[in-house]
């Protein structure tokens, strides 16, 4: 009787998005290029997370990290924000535009979030939740046998939680829904 009421355990592969739903950027591309690609992803309704790959021919399929909207905003302001923390209140006028323009020639590798963890696609969803929390990430690569086969995103987990709350327990398929971050 208890087994009839227990929901089946969901796996990472039930929620991950395949790699073809993401745009790729080479690690040596400029922030200006990255911003254009991020805008393209947004307009296409794709995840606003760019996959950063190596720039060398031998590394072109090696995933080095991700660039998210947070990486773009805070990555351009890194030295300024660190200085502001130490000195306290400062004069802000014109600072945002100046920092943005100064940072346009930075490289994707300078602002990306490197991959610090991954989860196997065959793991239970709770393992992904644990790792996302542990590393304070929103995205996590999902590994098949020996390579990255997809990416699980916290928004897709949240979508499932919302479905659970509304009584739609069986619906675990990931829909392509535009989201921010």
What are these regions (language model features)?
Residues 1-181:
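Tandem CBS (Cystathionine beta-synthase) repeat/Bateman regulatory domains
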């Amino acid at each position: 009787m208890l087994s009839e009421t227990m929901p089946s355990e969901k796996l990472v592969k039930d929620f991950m998005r395949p790699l073809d739903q993401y745009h790729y950027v080479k690690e040596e591309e400029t922030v200006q290029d990255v911003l254009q690609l991020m805008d393209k992803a947004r307009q296409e309704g794709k995840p606003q997370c760019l996959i950063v790959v190596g720039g060398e021919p031998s590394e072109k399929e090696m995933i080095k990290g991700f660039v998210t909207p947070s990486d773009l905003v805070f990555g351009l302001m890194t030295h300024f924000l660190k200085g502001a923390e130490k000195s306290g209140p400062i004069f802000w006028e014109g600072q945002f535009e100046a920092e943005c323009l100064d940072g346009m020639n930075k490289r994707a590798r300078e602002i990306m979030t490197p991959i610090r963890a991954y989860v196997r696609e065959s793991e239970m969803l709770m393992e992904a939740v644990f790792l996302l929390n542990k590393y304070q990430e929103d995205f996590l690569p999902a590994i098949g046998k020996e390579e990255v086969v997809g990416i699980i995103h916290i928004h897709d987990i949240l979508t499932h939680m919302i479905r659970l709350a509304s009584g739609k327990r069986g619906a675990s398929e990931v829909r392509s829904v535009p989201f921010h971050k």
